[in-house]
């Protein structure tokens, strides 16, 4: 008869099983291999700039394992020595939110978008406007746009001249605003003229119908009068019998 496992063997089995499933400390992973890396870069290896920029752009998070640091990208994980220069730079960049998914794009956008902080002072009563500030604002606005968009720059400059200058920044721009307003009124007037022109055929048609109805009424009245007069003549006519001739 076979004897089962004793208490000592069962205890040793549970002890080794607990060692295999023991979780790691923080982000270091576990002994079972939760710090698995798809690609491990040996220490002292020179990283190409293109590869490093790719990692900065698509970095999601990183984990501090026991002897290395694992960087989790979108499709794979890359591990490197914790003492390597590129590893420390990448960790520092991600911790300061200067790279990674969602961080690097906003940082790149803030880096390339110019900040226009120039403001135009409002004109006060009794004080002439500061033309130097207006010229400085115009030059700043022109330098903000790239050289490949001249039409947009011209449209914005024209809009700035027609909206800001007529409010008291220059008398020379008032005729331009008045001409624009006059042109706007002229554009509205053809619409009213078109409505009047559309009513003319309708009125003409109504007049023609009225004259036709009047002519038909006159014709019917004339026919009735003619019939009545002919019947009256028949009533007034009395036939006369011929007298008998004497023998």
From Swiss-Prot:
The chain crosses the membrane at residues 199-219. Keywords: Chemotaxis, Cytokine, Disulfide bond, Glycoprotein, Membrane, Signal, Transmembrane, Transmembrane helix. Glycosylated. Induction: By interleukin-18 and the induction is strongly mediated by an activator protein-1-dependent pathway. Its main location: membrane. One of its GO terms (cellular component) is extracellular space. Residues 120-152 are annotated as: Disordered. Residues 131-147 have a biased composition (Low complexity). The keyword Disulfide bond applies. Disulfide bonds join 35-65, 37-79. Residues 220-247 are cytoplasmic. GO terms for molecular function: chemokine activity; chemokine receptor binding; low-density lipoprotein particle receptor activity; scavenger receptor activity. Residues 1-26 form the signal peptide. This is C-X-C motif chemokine 16. It comes from Rattus norvegicus. The lineage of its organism: Eukaryota, Metazoa, Chordata, Craniata, Vertebrata.
């Amino acid at each position: 008869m076979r004897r089962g496992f004793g208490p000592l063997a069962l205890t040793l089995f549970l002890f080794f099983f607990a060692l295999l499933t023991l979780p790691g400390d923080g982000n270091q992973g576990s002994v079972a291999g939760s710090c698995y890396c798809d690609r491990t870069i040996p220490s002292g290896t020179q990283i190409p700039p293109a590869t490093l920029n790719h990692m900065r752009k698509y970095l999601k998070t990183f984990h501090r394992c026991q002897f290395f640091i694992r960087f989790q990208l979108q499709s794979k994980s890359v591990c490197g020595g914790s003492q390597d220069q590129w590893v420390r730079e990448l960790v520092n960049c991600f911790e300061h939110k200067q790279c990674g998914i969602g961080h690097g794009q906003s940082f790149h956008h803030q880096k390339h978008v110019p900040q226009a902080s120039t403001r135009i002072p409002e004109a006060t009563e009794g004080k002439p406007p500061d033309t130097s500030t207006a010229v400085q604002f115009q030059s700043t606005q022109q330098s903000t746009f790239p050289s490949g968009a001249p039409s947009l720059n011209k449209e914005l400059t024209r809009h700035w001249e027609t909206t800001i200058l007529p409010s008291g920044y220059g008398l020379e721009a008032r005729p331009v605003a008045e001409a624009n307003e006059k042109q706007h009124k002229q554009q509205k007037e053809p619409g009213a003229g078109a409505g009047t022109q559309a009513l003319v055929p309708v009125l003409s048609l109504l007049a023609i119908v009225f004259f036709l109805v009047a002519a038909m009424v006159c014709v019917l009245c004339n026919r009735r009068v003619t019939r009545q007069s002919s019947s009256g003549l028949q009533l007034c006519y009395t036939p006369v019998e011929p007298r008998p001739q004497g023998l």
